[in-house]
Regions:
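Well-ordered beta-strand positions
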Residues: 1, 90-92, 158
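Bacterial N-terminal signal peptides
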Residues: 1-9
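Long terminal accessory segments
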Residues: 150-158
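N-terminal domain-onset segments
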Residues: 14-92, 96-145, 162-168, 172-184
Length: 184
C-alpha cells in the first residue's frame, strides 16, 4: 500500500478533465504545497471566493472511528502498541464544505491541552497543533479521484526535528475549483 501511495505522488492529472486542466486546481495545488497549513489556505480561498461573510473556516467533526492501516502506522513511526487517535472533519466556509479530512495522529506527541481541545471541540487540527511549528510533507497528490473530489492529498505532519505525529488524507471539493457563479 505504501508503494501505491508513493507512486500516486507522481501521477499527473488526467488530461482533458475539468479539474486536471483547471487553472484554479493548479493554483490550489501550489497553495497547498506552500508553507501554510491547509486551514490557512482554505481561509484565504474562502474569502477570495466570497463564499461567506466573514470568510472564515470552521471544522465540523464527524464522530466515527477508523483504525489506522499498517502503512499509516509505519509512516507515523508508531510503536507496536502505541495508540493512535482518529479524527474526521469537514472544513466549511459558511454552508459550503471545502474539504473533508481523515486524520490519524499520535496523541503522545501532543500536549495534554492540545489533546483535550481535539477531543472536546471542532477546532481544526492544524490550528490546534500550530504551536508545534510543524511542517507538512506531501506523500501523494491525486487529481480527479471522483466527481466530488477534484483533489486528494495525503500528507504527514512533522515536528521541526522530523518526528511524524499526524497523517492526513484531505479530499478537496469541486466548489474550490469550480465555484458557483454569482449574478451581479
Amino acid at each position: 500500500m505504501l508503494s501505491a501511495v508513493l507512486l500516486l505522488a507522481a501521477a499527473p492529472a488526467r488530461a482533458g478533465t475539468a479539474g486536471g486542466s483547471s487553472p484554479a486546481l493548479a493554483r490550489l495545488k501550489a497553495d497547498l504545497a506552500g508553507p501554510e497549513s491547509a486551514t490557512q489556505v482554505l481561509t484565504r480561498w474562502c474569502g477570495e471566493l466570497h463564499l461567506a461573510e466573514p470568510g472564515r473556516i470552521r471544522a465540523v467533526r464527524v464522530h466515527q472511528d477508523k483504525p489506522a492501516a499498517h502503512w499509516i502506522r509505519q509512516m507515523l513511526h508508531a510503536r507496536p502498541r502505541e495508540r493512535l487517535r482518529y479524527r474526521r472533519v469537514q472544513l466549511m466556509c459558511g454552508a459550503h464544505i471545502l474539504s473533508e479530512a481523515d486524520n490519524w495522529y499520535r496523541p503522545a506527541r501532543l500536549t495534554a491541552a492540545m489533546n483535550r481541545i481535539l477531543d472536546t471541540t471542532d477546532r481544526s487540527f492544524g490550528a490546534v497543533v500550530r504551536p508545534l511549528n510543524f511542517h507538512r510533507r506531501t506523500l501523494s497528490r491525486q487529481s480527479d479521484t471522483d466527481a466530488m473530489t477534484p483533489l486528494r492529498l495525503t500528507a504527514v505532519l512533522e515536528t521541526p526535528d522530523g518526528e511524524p505525529f499526524s497523517l492526513v488524507v484531505e479530499n478537496y471539493r469541486p466548489i474550490l475549483v469550480m465555484p458557483p457563479r454569482h449574478s451581479h
